[in-house]
Amino acid sequence: MARREEAKEFEERVVTINRVAKVVKGGRRFRFTALVVVGDKNGRVGFGTGKAQEVPEAIKKAVEAAKKDLVVVPRVEGTTPHTITGRFSSGSVFMKPAAPGTGVIAGGPVRAVLELAGITDILSKSLGSNTPINMVRATINGLKNLKNAEDVAKLRGKSVEELYN
């Protein structure tokens, strides 16, 4: 019973499934890799990769890996607290807060991460490498580096009101 409740805690989204081959003496051996993003649409999101000989098994492995590495995303009224650029390898993702009602303006893998993080209004642009894994990692990197006003005030030893004056 506990296993079913845990499954409902996070929503899963398969970003890519890729067939990879190992060349051996007798020919090629095929396997599948899966890139999956999981999130609760309430500020927690993670991604994982899995590899197996069958697609469902690869997805299952990826989901387990994603649940082990969750990131908490600070949100302000359904968007990010400030503009940020996430970078990974040669790919970068620029994310900018948007007014309520704008929606998620993002492409493919970036959209999956932002929606499952619970962000409802944001503008984003992916630059450089457009490999799905690089885009997902760059997005997660950017979300990890977000700071809300309370965190900044605490770091500076001031109150939130003092920051805005």
From Swiss-Prot:
This is Small ribosomal subunit protein uS5. With S4 and S12 plays an important role in translational accuracy. Located at the back of the 30S subunit body where it stabilizes the conformation of the head with respect to the body. The N-terminal domain interacts with the head of the 30S subunit; the C-terminal domain interacts with the body and contacts protein S4. The interaction surface between S4 and S5 is involved in control of translational fidelity. The keyword Transcription does not apply. Belongs to the universal ribosomal protein uS5 family. Pfam families: Ribosomal_S5 (PF00333), Ribosomal_S5_C (PF03719). InterPro entries: Ribosomal_Su5_D2-typ_SF, Ribosomal_uS5, Ribosomal_uS5_bac-type, Ribosomal_uS5_C, Ribosomal_uS5_N, Ribosomal_uS5_N_CS, Ribsml_uS5_D2-typ_fold_subgr. One of its GO terms (molecular function) is structural constituent of ribosome. Residues 10-73 form the S5 DRBM domain.
